[in-house]
């Protein structure tokens, strides 16, 4: 049996639209083995127990590339990553499927080939890359090839995810974005993306609040998330380092100093006054990325 563990990811980190992403310590686990016939799913809802299951779709893509034909499959899922909340649940399924398929087929593809294949299936590298590699990454796609660099994050910072009880599909969140942008808005984001990477690298945490600002996606998507601005304002009052929409949302991600012991309790009290229910989870950066049979990919 092959066991694969994939971390949740938070993409964009404010201005780094479709390029920055970070892995955090929430995980999905996949247990896959070859059986005599059929496809057996365990640990997921009945509506996902078919060949359209994203994990199976990713596995088949890998098998087809390698030229491997399993007799049958048993796929067991232990999922802790919330679905459609902007925490990379689909990327985790794609990565888990491709990596487990490759392992079953004898490891025919190397890490680079697996990464390129996963981005081909998922569509964007910002979640897939940190899910594979761990840590924070800056990624681009160049002629279907994934190019990336690890972003060093200085010690002394942690994350806090504010996860609502409602979902937001990536398709809906994409649909509200404009077809084109002003030149000055592009410059605005380029500067703040560079500042974000530099501030995290050098430990200039006081600059993060400036670097989190964005003009390409967050304001458009905030309209789909009730109380986004009031929550953001409250986080800032509670001395957060920075606040941004995690991926396409609706999860709101907060950056904090490691020694901040009061934020989670205080923001939870505020969130309890709102209509929707919000879960508060303090998180650390996952530095390992995808783990296969207890070894780093």
Curated annotation (Swiss-Prot):
GO terms for cellular component: cytoplasm. InterPro entries: GHMP_kinase_C_dom, GHMP_kinase_C_sf, GHMP_kinase_N_dom, GHMP_knse_ATP-bd_CS, Homoserine_kinase, Ribosomal_Su5_D2-typ_SF, Ribsml_uS5_D2-typ_fold_subgr. ATP binds at residues 82-92. GO terms for molecular function: ATP binding; homoserine kinase activity. It catalyses: L-homoserine + ATP = O-phospho-L-homoserine + ADP + H(+). It is an enzyme of class 2 (transferase). One of its GO terms (biological process) is threonine biosynthetic process. Pathway: Amino-acid biosynthesis; L-threonine biosynthesis; L-threonine from L-aspartate: step 4/5. Its EC number is 2.7.1.39. The keyword Nucleotide-binding applies. It is found in: Cytoplasm. It holds the Pfam family GHMP_kinases_N. It comes from the Bacteria. The keyword Transferase applies. Its main location: cytoplasm. Keywords: Amino-acid biosynthesis, ATP-binding, Cytoplasm, Kinase, Nucleotide-binding, Threonine biosynthesis, Transferase. Catalyzes the ATP-dependent phosphorylation of L-homoserine to L-homoserine phosphate. Belongs to the GHMP kinase family. Homoserine kinase subfamily. This is Homoserine kinase.
């Amino acid at each position: 049996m092959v066991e694969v563990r994939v971390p949740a990811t938070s993409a964009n980190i404010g201005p780094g639209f479709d390029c920055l992403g970070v892995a955090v310590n929430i995980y999905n686990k996949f247990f896959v083995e070859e059986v005599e016939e059929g496809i057996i799913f365990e640990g997921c809802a009945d509506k996902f127990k078919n060949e359209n299951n994203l994990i199976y779709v990713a596995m088949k893509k890998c098998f087809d590339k390698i030229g491997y034909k399993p007799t049958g499959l048993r796929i067991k899922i232990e999922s802790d990553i919330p679905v459609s909340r902007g925490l990379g649940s689909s990327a985790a399924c794609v990565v888990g499927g491709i990596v487990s398929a490759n392992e079953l087929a004898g490891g025919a593809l190397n890490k680079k080939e697996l990464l390129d294949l996963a981005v081909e299936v998922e569509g964007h590298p910002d979640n897939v890359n940190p899910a594979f590699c761990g840590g924070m990454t800056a990624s681009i796609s160049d002629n279907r090839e994934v190019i990336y660099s690890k972003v060093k994050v200085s010690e002394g910072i942690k994350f806090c995810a504010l996860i609502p009880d409602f979902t937001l599909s990536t398709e809906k969140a994409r649909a509200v974005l404009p077809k084109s942008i002003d030149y000055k808005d592009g410059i605005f984001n380029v500067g703040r993306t560079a500042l974000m990477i530099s501030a995290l690298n050098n430990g200039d945490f006081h600059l993060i609040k400036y670097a989190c600002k964005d003009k390409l996606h967050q304001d458009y998507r905030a309209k789909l998330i009730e109380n986004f601005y009031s929550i953001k304002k409250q986080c800032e009052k509670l001395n957060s380092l920075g606040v941004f929409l995690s991926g396409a949302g609706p999860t709101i991600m907060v950056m904090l100093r490691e020694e901040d012991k009061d934020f989670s309790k205080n923001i939870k009290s505020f969130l309890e006054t709102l209509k929707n229910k919000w879960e508060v989870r303090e998180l650390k950066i996952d530095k390992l990325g995808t783990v296969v049979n207890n070894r780093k990919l």
